[in-house]
UniProtKB/Swiss-Prot annotation:
It comes from the Eukaryota. This is Melanocyte-stimulating hormone receptor. GO terms for biological process: adenylate cyclase-activating G protein-coupled receptor signaling pathway. The chain crosses the membrane at residues 38-63, 73-93, 119-140, 164-183, 192-211, 241-266, 280-300. The keyword Isomerase does not apply. PROSITE patterns: G_PROTEIN_RECEP_F1_1 (PS00237), G_PROTEIN_RECEP_F1_2 (PS50262). GO terms for molecular function: melanocyte-stimulating hormone receptor activity. The lineage of its organism: Eukaryota, Metazoa, Chordata, Craniata, Vertebrata. Glycans are attached at N29. Belongs to the G-protein coupled receptor 1 family. Receptor for MSH (alpha, beta and gamma) and ACTH. The activity of this receptor is mediated by G proteins which activate adenylate cyclase. Mediates melanogenesis, the production of eumelanin (black/brown) and phaeomelanin (red/yellow), via regulation of cAMP signaling in melanocytes.
Length: 317
């Protein structure tokens, strides 16, 4: 990940020895003041990564199998699953290598570990950027399908979707390579934070606008059928609750990680910030949790995809 030297975990593992860590403890900073440090067990981290890996592999397999799902919307969902798969897979790979280094089962030179670290960092960073981009792309696709319903199939065509997907992957890989190469520069970390905030604002604006249009549509139906207003109010409350959950999960899972990046720039030596830095793996775990939740929100709610998924599972048995 694009962190300063303190977060280069693979290199640090070369000279480390296996130690037992509690699940929750107080770590002291350099002044002796206690810091709340939450230690995520490697087993839990790997288990969450494995769940994410299996979920997203199933989504990709189901979409690839069913030609009816080869539409622009499902292409974006498939790419989101693929990028989430790479997020969890790269973090699992890094954790596995750390465990092997700490156990002495993997003996190698520091230069080799540095190259491996850089490769994993680029893979992780590019997959995270892709994941954020495809979340934004799905929001844009849904927005166009609602506000330009009659022209949707002429606006969002499969060739355009493929070009957008290719552009996102290429831009993410190139950007992450530059980010890792210049990760010690504050401007790089600020760019990542600004990018996250831009995606958050984009999704919030689009989904709020879509909710407002849906409420207007429900109100029109209510007037047409002369139903009472509470039915419309109930629809608005359900829509607001769904929107709150959608954006809340996105912010809670991704926000702490980008807050960490921002604090690295703003207060790298501050005592409170130093305490927050100690919980870096917690922030990564939240991102892994988001890769588990994404298929539940964007993929498994589709009946067509779920039917195909059952076929894939039955064929595998």
């Amino acid at each position: 990940m694009p962190m300063q030297g303190a977060q280069r975990r693979l290199l640090g593992s070369l000279n480390s020895t296996p130690t037992a860590t509690p699940n929750l403890g107080l770590a002291a900073n350099h002044t002796g003041a206690p810091c709340l440090e939450v230690s995520i067990p490697h087993g839990l981290f790997l288990s969450l990564g494995l769940v994410s890996l299996v979920e997203n592999v199933l989504v990709v397999a189901a979409i690839a199998k069913n030609r009816n799902l080869h539409s622009p919307m499902y292409c974006f969902i498939c790419c989101l699953a693929l990028s989430d798969l790479l997020v969890s897979g790269s973090n699992m790979l890094e954790t596995a290598v750390i465990l092997l280094l700490e156990a002495g089962a993997l003996a190698t030179r520091a230069s080799v570990v540095q190259q491996l670290q850089n490769t994993i960092d680029v893979l992780t960073c590019s997959s995270m950027l892709c994941s954020l981009c495809f979340l934004g792309a799905i929001a844009v696709d849904r927005y166009v399908s609602i506000f330009y319903a009659l022209r949707y199939h002429s606006i969002v065509t499969l060739p355009r979707a493929r070009r957008a997907i290719a552009a996102i992957w290429v831009a993410s890989v190139l950007s992450s390579t530059l980010f890792i190469a210049y990760c010690d520069h504050a401007a790089v970390l600020l760019c990542l934070v600004v990018f996250f905030l831009a995606m958050l604002v984009l999704m919030a604006v689009l989904y709020v606008h879509m909710l407002a249009r849906a409420c207007q549509h429900a109100q029109g139906i209510t007037r047409l059928h002369k139903r009472q207003l509470p039915a419309h109010q109930g629809f608005g409350l359900r829509g607001a609750a769904t929107l709150t959950i959608l954006l809340g999960i996105f912010f809670l899972c991704w926000g702490p990680f980008f807050l960490h990046l921002m604090l690295v720039v703003l207060c790298p030596q501050h005592l409170t910030c130093s305490c927050i830095f100690k919980n870096f793996k917690v922030f990564l775990t939240l991102i892994i949790c988001n890769t588990i939740i994404d298929p539940l929100i964007y993929a498994f709610r589709s009946q067509e995809l779920c039917r195909t998924l059952k076929e894939v599972l039955l064929c595998s048995w």
